[in-house]
Amino acid sequence: PNHIHDIFQNGLPADFRLIGATTRMPNEIPPAIRSRCLEVFFRELEKDELKTVAKTAADKIEKNISEEGLDLLTSYTRNGREAVNMIQIAAGMAVTENRKDITIEDIEWVIHSSQLTPKHEQKIGVEPQVGIVNGLAVYGPNSGSLLEIEVSVTAAQDKGSINITGIAEEESIGSQSKSIRRKSMAKGSVENVLTVLRTMGMKPSDYDIHINFPGGIPIDGPSAGIAMAAGIFSAIHKIPIDNTVAMTGEISLNGLVKPIGGVIPKIKAAKQSGAKKVIIPYENQQAILKQIDGIEIIAVKTFQEVLDEILVNPPTEQKPFHIEINKESV
């Protein structure tokens, strides 16, 4: 027909907008599609929001669930779909036994049968400690988590050593069709940390240093740089670190704090873990951060500023530390 021929020749006079939604990770989507799309990432639901979703799902099928049951359920769910699915399966058990209530035993059965793992919900320590520092990490598409880093230092018998546990030795980058392996950036940033400590007059080679990342969170990237440096400094000088402060930022060879990614989910994770302050790189300041209430956000340019914020009762008669920074690099 002529109208079909005209469409092939001249196109269709319309402006189309195709909207697609997916739960896939960004690196699982073909680059040819991503390059032609405007990507919009939705934040992860908070625990109270997941409770609301689960409670609404239970009300729709006329079943009751206790607050303790909601707490347990939301500890194992990461989105609304998972919460609704767990409610429906647990409600099926209640219907079979002619019960109006969804019990904790029902939810535990769903958890064990589905082999679910709890979400990582780290809380800050109860008091300042030497060598214990609160770092921040991002895992998954947009989930933040508090990262308690432990540092132990002992005098070396001969030449000192450094041992790092809890992080990947190597990273794989690229797509499913092509990827390369490289040394972990998190492990490589330790070398930057040691260089900065040497410029402060310290001798890391005199000590056996052990840095541990507990909790099983996959750490990648150099964003734990200032946290590792603070932990080593605290362990060597025996100065406690404020347990109510969390921090994130890359550290350069000159002692500067460089910007990192995922700053918003990291700040929210610090707030949820009970931290009162969070330290971020100066270059990560954004107007949207002013909308986050309940936590003080401190933007720093140098590692010296980090130490000024976190050390508890440092020696005042003579500071044993100082970083010489090239002013032109700031």
Feature names for model-found ranges:
Residues 26-32, 39-104, 199-206, 239-242:
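Conserved C-terminal "switch" segment of AAA+ ATPases
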Residues 1-21:
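AAA+/SF3 P-loop NTPase mechanochemical coupling elements
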Residues 19-22, 37, 50, 73, ...:
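Conserved RecA-like P-loop NTPase ATPase core
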Residues 3-5, 69, 263:
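Amphipathic coiled-coil/heptad-repeat helices and related helical stalk/stem segments
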Residues 121, 126-133, 147, 153-330:
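Peripheral, non-AAA+ core regions of ATP-driven protein-machinery
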Residues 18, 39-41, 297-299:
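Conserved beta-strand scaffold positions in the cores of enzyme catalytic domains, especially
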Residues 88, 93-122, 282:
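Conserved C-terminal helix/linker of AAA+ ATPases
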Residues 43, 66-67, 73-83, 100-104, ...:
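Conserved phosphate/pyrophosphate-binding and hydrolysis machinery centered on Walker-type P-loop NTPases
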